[in-house]
Amino acid sequence: MCIGIPLRVLECAPGRALCGDENGVRWIDTRLVEPPAPGDWLLVFLDAAREILDAGRAARIREALRALQAVQAGDPAALAGLFADLDREPQLPPHLQAQLPPKEPT
């Protein structure tokens, strides 16, 4: 499985960007994406940017990665805040709801 890590751009140079998160700072190859700007978020795999992310998507990916760490650490209590919607019933998308038979009146 490949897991991309969201990193924030701190400084830019041709073909690379200095990026960081709570685990440190490192140079990332940016030749596969449009040139980023300081403050942008990059999805990084093997020290190469694969995608420029908006802040919301970067936050969701970071939360999912924290959830994986909590599971690996055996801390199920930490999952409640990371997956607050687990107690709701899943909803089918509209195109699949349209294929369901009509509900019988009760």
From Swiss-Prot:
What InterPro entries does the record point to?
A: Hydgase_assmbl_chp_CS, Hydrogenase_HupF/HypC
Gene Ontology biological process: protein maturation
Q: Name one Pfam family in it.
A: HupF_HypC
According to the UniProt entry, its GO molecular function terms are: carbon dioxide binding; iron ion binding
UniProt similarity note: Belongs to the HupF/HypC family.
Q: What is this protein's name?
A: Hydrogenase expression/formation protein HoxL
Encoding gene (name): hoxL
